[in-house]
Amino acid sequence: MRNARSAGHTGGMSENGSGVVLAVSLDGSHRFSKVPVEEIRLREGWGVDGDAHAGVTVQHRSRVARDPTQPNLRQVHLVHAELFDEVDAAGYAVAPGELGENVTTRGIDLLGLPTGTVLHLGESAAVEVTGLRNPCAQINGFEQGLLGELVGRDADGDVVRKAGVMAVVLAGGAVRPGDGIRVELPSGERLPLRPV
């Protein structure tokens, strides 16, 4: 398995440096899509206040069914808006929050970041990237055929997952559309993202 960056899909985005928050979304229920809002509040070690996926232990239903004591590595879901541009060209109209993400970004190659990258959002919030979102069949329930655009294979036959990244909250704070994002790459060995 290779991530999108190793498959050559940087799309002109920055893999270190900076980007911007395009939208923020949350939902207190376990629905596929989230509702765009003016602001979300991140809480250290917890996630997005008021979001169904916030918590110290796993909150995603499939993971709770397997082992409810697992640490929650999916407190915050981030998707790059460049993905919306890509699927729009294939005939799928997707708006911020509709893929279930809490933070929609622009200008950062999220999929090309190594595990452990810290994203500084706005004035004080920070999240650590834990891995790739593993797209599931619910995506086709949202829009038939979209899953095929979010999971594919590269020229070497390796699986490419494009549905964003998951993170845990290191430092709390408010995050709003228009906030800057600063990328802090991990020191030492840089491990590629894997599904979490």
Feature-to-residue mapping (PLM):
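Metal-cofactor-dependent catalytic cores
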Residues: 2-196
